[in-house]
Curated annotation (Swiss-Prot):
Source taxon at top rank: Bacteria
GO MF entries: ATP binding; proton-transporting ATP synthase activity, rotational mechanism
Subunit and partners: F-type ATPases have 2 components, CF(1) - the catalytic core - and CF(0) - the membrane proton channel. CF(1) has five subunits: alpha(3), beta(3), gamma(1), delta(1), epsilon(1). CF(0) has three main subunits: a, b and c.
Name of the protein in its database record: ATP synthase epsilon chain 2
Location in or out of the cell: Cell inner membrane
Species this chain originates from: Syntrophotalea carbinolica (strain DSM 2380 / NBRC 103641 / GraBd1) (Pelobacter carbinolicus)
Entry function: Produces ATP from ADP in the presence of a proton gradient across the membrane.
Length: 138
């Protein structure tokens, strides 16, 4: 059994990560889950949320959008729509997006076509604010 995981994260625009890590924690569609070296093979979906990985005593955080995770042997492949590291999140922009989504949701009902899109925008903004607020490595 390997002592490290090979983590690769890819978006449609670019490869975001290619790192040797000790563990990951991901926002699965059925709840948060973790992966350590030697994990059982797995293919699952991700929801909007905070993704983290640990290298030694340092923990790194990203805001991710919907996607997939494949765990095979000691490799973790993450395919997501978007992924932003703490350093690349514009906190003021994320807070503005949160305000816009909250305001728009107050005007809508669940029957409106736009309602679920605004809920998703609200969730993305909240995750981006949470990740940006981590203030460096955990």
């Amino acid at each position: 059994m390997a002592q490290k995981l090979k983590l690769e994260m890819v978006t449609p625009a670019a490869q975001v990560l290619s790192e040797e890590v000790d563990e990951i924690a991901a926002p699965g569609s059925l709840g948060q889950f973790g992966v350590l070296p030697g994990h059982t093979p797995l293919l699952t979906t991700l929801q909007v949320g905070e993704f983290s990985y640990r290298k030694g005593s340092d923990v790194y955080y990203l805001a991710v959008n919907w996607g997939y995770v494949e765990v095979a042997e000691d490799r973790v492949l993450v395919l997501v729509e978007t992924a932003e590291t703490q350093d690349h999140i514009d906190l003021a922009r994320a807070k503005a997006a949160l305000g816009r989504a909250e305001a728009r949701l107050r005007e809508l009902t669940p029957a409106d076509k736009e309602y679920h899109n605004m809920q998703a925008a609200l969730q993305r903004a909240m995750v981006r604010i949470q990740v940006a607020g981590r203030g460096g490595r955990g």
